[in-house]
Structure formats: C-alpha cells, structure tokens
Curated annotation (Swiss-Prot):
It comes from Rattus norvegicus (Rat). Functions as a sodium-dependent neutral amino acid transporter. Exhibits preference for the branched-chain amino acids, particularly leucine, valine and isoleucine and methionine. Can also transport low-affinity substrates such as alanine, phenylalanine, glutamine and pipecolic acid. Mediates the saturable, pH-sensitive and electrogenic cotransport of proline and sodium ions with a stoichiometry of 1:1. May have a role as transporter for neurotransmitter precursors into neurons. In contrast to other members of the neurotransmitter transporter family, does not appear to be chloride-dependent. Widely distributed in the central nervous system, including the olfactory bulb, the hypothalamus, the cerebral cortex, the hippocampus, and the cerebellum. In addition, intense expression is found in the motor nuclei including the oculomotor nucleus, abducens nucleus, trigeminal motor nucleus, facial nucleus, hypoglossal nucleus and ventral horn of spinal cord. It comes from the Eukaryota. It catalyses: L-leucine(in) + Na(+)(in) = L-leucine(out) + Na(+)(out); L-isoleucine(in) + Na(+)(in) = L-isoleucine(out) + Na(+)(out); L-methionine(in) + Na(+)(in) = L-methionine(out) + Na(+)(out); L-proline(in) + Na(+)(in) = L-proline(out) + Na(+)(out). This is Sodium-dependent neutral amino acid transporter B(0)AT2. Residues 163-225, 357-452 are extracellular. The lineage of its organism: Eukaryota, Metazoa, Chordata, Craniata, Vertebrata.
Amino acid sequence: MPKNSKVVKRDLDDDVIESVKDLLSNEDSVEDVSKKSELIVDVQEEKDTDAEDGSEVDDERPAWNSKLQYILAQVGFSVGLGNVWRFPYLCQKNGGGAYLLPYLILLLVIGIPLFFLELSVGQRIRRGSIGVWNYISPKLGGIGFASCVVCYFVALYYNVIIGWTLFYFSQSFQQPLPWDQCPLVKNASHTYIEPECEKSSATTYYWYREALAISSSISESGGLNWKMTGCLLAAWVMVCLAMIKGIQSSGKIMYFSSLFPYVVLICFLIRSLLLNGSIDGIRHMFTPKLEMMLEPKVWREAATQVFFALGLGFGGVIAFSSYNKRDNNCHFDAVLVSFINFFTSVLATLVVFAVLGFKANIVNEKCISQNSEMILKLLKTGNVSWDVIPRHINLSAVTAEDYHVVYDIIQKVKEEEFAVLHLKACQIEDELNKAVQGTGLAFIAFTEAMTHFPASPFWSVMFFLMLINLGLGSMFGTIEGIITPVVDTFKVRKEILTVICCLLAFCIGLMFVQRSGNYFVTMFDDYSATLPLLIVVILENIAVSFVYGIDKFLEDLTDMLGFAPSKYYYYMWKYISPLMLVTLLIASIVNMGLSPPGYNAWIKEKASEEFLSYPMWGMVVCFSLMVLAILPVPVVFVIRRCNLIDDSSGNLASVTYKRGRVLKEPVNLDGDDASLIHGKIPSEMSSPNFGKNIYRKQSGSPTLDTAPNGRYGIGYLMADMPDMPESDL
C-alpha cells in the first residue's frame, strides 16, 4: 500500500517508552482533559455541511479519555472468571508448573499475534466487527455478524453466573455464613440433620438445594427460581446502566472493576500464606510433571485457554480499539494486556491453591483424627498388637508423620486383612488431586475453605465482590462487541439499542433461572462459542493475510505505528497461526465427537452428581447453537456473491457522532463511486475515474496510488487517507 510521506520513523524502544509514559500520564492539564473529553476521532476535526439545512455537523467518534482507561477496559474484558476458576484447574490437571511452558509458547504463537491483529484492524478502520470485515471484503462481512451472535449467546448465560455471584454476595453478610453448617430437620419426635446435606457437605447442599433449587434432569423444568430471577434482573440492570452511554459510562467504571480484583487477590494471597497447609497447596500446584508435556491433550487445552483468555473472535477487542487514536501503539497494548492476563492467571492460581491447601490440611487433620480413633479401637479389641506401635507415638494426639508410620506398619502386619479394617491413608495430596473448576470451585470448594477463615463473612464479601467485578468487566466487552458494530452499521441510537438488547437478553435468560437452568448454562457454555469462535478467528486471519494482503496490512501498520512491525508477525499471520488454528479446530471437533454430549445432573436421593446424556431435543439445541452462530458467514457471502441485495442505490448513510447523538446523513454516490464502495474489482468498473463524493473533505491533500493487484479497490485506497472516511460496508 502507498506509504504516508508524513510518517515519522521512530525507533521501537523510543516508541515503547512513549507508550509507557502515555499510559502512566494521569496529571493532564485542564485543557488536555477538556480536549480528551470531546471524544474526537480524527487528528483533524472534520466538519460537514448537511445537504438539506446547510448546518455544520462535527463528525466525531467517541474516544477514550486516557490511555490508562483503554488498557483497563481491555484488561477487564480479557481477565474474567476463567482466570480464577479455569486456569488453576488446567494447570493442576496438566502437569502443574510444566503446564506453564506450553501455555507461554502458545501465548507467543497464537495469543499475542492474533490479539495484535484484532487491535490493529479495529484501530485502523475505526469500526466494530461488522464494519471492519465489510471493509476488508464485503463478502466476508458475515464474520462480524457471527461475532455478534456468539457474543449474545455468551452474554445470555454469563450474566446468569454474575446473578449467582450476586446472590452469594448478598448472603455473605451473616455470622455464621449460611453454608457453614448443615440444616436441621425437626419433626414431632426428634431433630436430625438434613439427609441430603449429611451425605454430601454443607456447601454442596447450599449450592444445589438452597441457591439453585435444582431439578434432577434438564427435562424437569421445575418452574422459575424467584431468588435467582431477581438476581438476574439486578445483573442486567447493572450492565444496562453501565453500557447505556457506551465507553463514556463503562470506561469510568473500569477504574474500579478492573483494579479491585487485584486488590482482593493480593489480600487473599497474603492471608492464605499465613494459614496452615497453604505452602503444601502451592508446592503441589507448581511441582512440574514434565512427562505430561508430551501429551497432545495438554497442548490442545493450553491453546484453547490462550484463545479464550484473550477474548479473541468476540468483537469486544475490535470494538474497544476502534475508539483509539489512529497513531496509538497497539503493538505495545497487545503485548502488555497479554502478559497482564497471563500473570493474573498465575496470581489467581497461587491464591486458589494456597486456599485449597489450607482446606486440604483441615480435611486431612479430620481424617487422621477419625482413623486414629479406629486404630485405638483395633488395639483395645486385640485385632492389632500394641507391640507393633512405636513407643514414642501417642495415638490420642498423633501428628501426620506419626500417623503415616503407624498406617504403614499396620498395612504390613495385617496385609491380608487390611482391606476390611477400612483405614485411610490420609494424604494431603489425595485431597489436592480432587481438582475442581468452574462453579464447583467458586461456590463449593472455595466457600467451604472460607468458612474456616477468621472473620469469614468479610472474606466471603470480598471474594464474591471480586467475582462480580471480574464478570462485569468481561460483560462490558461482550456487550460492546454487540452494540458497537450494530450502531456503526444500522445507525440506531446507542441508548435505545442497549436497553432493548439487555431487556431481550433478560427475557431469554429466564430459561437459565428455572430449577433446571444450571444444565442449560452448561449446554450453552459447551456448544455456543467454542467451535464458532475458532472458525471466526480462522476467517479473520485469512481475511487479513490473504484477502486484504499481508504485505499491504504490514504497510498500514508501519504508517499507523511509525515503525515497521517485526517480521515475526509476517510469518505468524501468514503461516504459523492459520495452521495452528486449523489444527486446534480439528482437535476440538475430534474431542467433541469422542465426548458424549451430556451434563452432570444432581441426584437428590444419592446426594451426588451423575452424568446424563441430553435428550433428543437437547441434542438439536446443541447443534442449532453452533449452526446459528456461524450461519451469518455463508449467508452474507452468498448474498454478496449473488447480488441478492441491491446495494448500489446511490444513497448510503454514513454515521456521525455529536453530543452523544447518532445522526444520519445521506451520501450521494456517482456510479463509479458506488462500484468502488461495493467491492467490485477494477475490471468490473465502468470507468477508471473516481467520483467526487466518495470521500468527505480531507484536511490535507494526500496522494492516491492505485493498487494494480488490489482485489477490493476501495479497501485499498481508503486505508491511505490520513483521515479515513467512515465506510458503510
């Protein structure tokens, strides 16, 4: 692509220093703050004259008040609940400390390059996901629509999880915590412990019976759970109020929602390190099992976690970056946010396993105490001789080391009869190996551990407030991935669209607050996003590298950043990343095919979970979720390819922003202009002369070079303009 002669070639190190200074610069003058608050998009202010009334309209796009606000928004979107309850589980399951190496490798090979790609296209084209991919190629415009559909599917159930967290948060202001003990059941004759709770645990019972009031299968609706319905309504009201003014409102909230979780995690880490057993948990967590690095499953799960941890394919990354200045160093942002995400995951893993180590130590002490009593009974009845017990061991107050010595002795002496003695080894590692993830970690394992904390209500309030903020940060990015592209494309008022979007989502979300709602959350989590997002990101990579052209894209980046990106990205975007994404897609499809579609149902009579297969209608819903999410891609391609919709009426609308209002202004196009905008290749154009009205008035007089090899003419030419026009494609 033709280079902008005004570009200043800067040294990469100097550019990074500038970015850091910009990020840490918060002491702006009153005039600077006023200028930033004006939400000006272009370097030069553009003013257009309305054809009907001759009034001037400031063509402005909302922008971030500061670089710090933008970084916090990206961090808030990428750092979510998965960092707390998914990454630690994967780390423990896949080799402990050894898992970090494949994760880091894949972060460098897949994560950072693709994250940088999404930031770049959003910042350069200054549109949401629909407008960006329409600009690259109208035939690939369905990629943006697919991203919006996936975002909406995810938002539907993700906010339900925030609703659950709100419920636990509201119940945490009690001493003792309501899930501390099993409830008692009274009848006319006597009082006894609730059988379902006695068979499981107090926290498990509270989660399934008190919070979810869960049914025994997905086919048993059981009606609405009114407590959770109210919490879901509160969650959607919070999201709606935060998003109703776009980044003007959500950006300010990000200062708290993005930073508060780090305060809580650090407090939890310091407190848990002072508890018995926490070091055992951390040691168990990070003890590397190097042999597991050779297993393909470990690499597949690491790649999947990298992919979803950064929010690739959702459109939120593109939407947030579209509000940046054009010369913002998005490469610095990509590296910074990616490593903040990684170190947050490691910090959360330290906290989780320090707390679980403390919990395992308590469980282990109970196990030793109970089994020591059993050994004393065996000694008193003569089943085991006192002579085999070392004299220095006191079974009334036995330590873990002494118990294991006695256990090993009895196992050798009573080798044939040992099984009938029902003694347990009571190893703390056995408890730590019972890895849990997701809601099981947050609402069962972690809540149980916190009941043993001094001042447990305080820590419970802090923990669930942290989860609420983590969830809301991700929700803001997800909703922005829906709102921004739709506003850019269909010219609707952002406030009205936000309210309608949230209201409709709440109504659909009522299916998740039935007594069987937890099973629908599992269904949507398993099938609505994984494969569709992989396909979306593969198509994004292909669109930039092969349709638009990797060389032209790198020239755009050089013009935009002021320095040439490393050749590393050329090879990643053109060869390595597409190959690895396709491999990951195939591996995910194979894994999905080998795993029977089903869910873990809570069986009241057994007080335990049991795997059940989905009924036939459930299978249809699972398949429909995947198809609906990716359907816009072929539909838009066929419509554009076959010209089923006439775009060349000569009256397109371009969106402008003024004082928070979205205005429509007609742009009359000559025939040649329309053919350019609608993506016709040069051979299909009726005239080589460009029309007069394609571009709005520019502040300079840039030189246009034609692209003899450009496939989509207008996409090539528009990117050369210092102040790129707002494309409606």
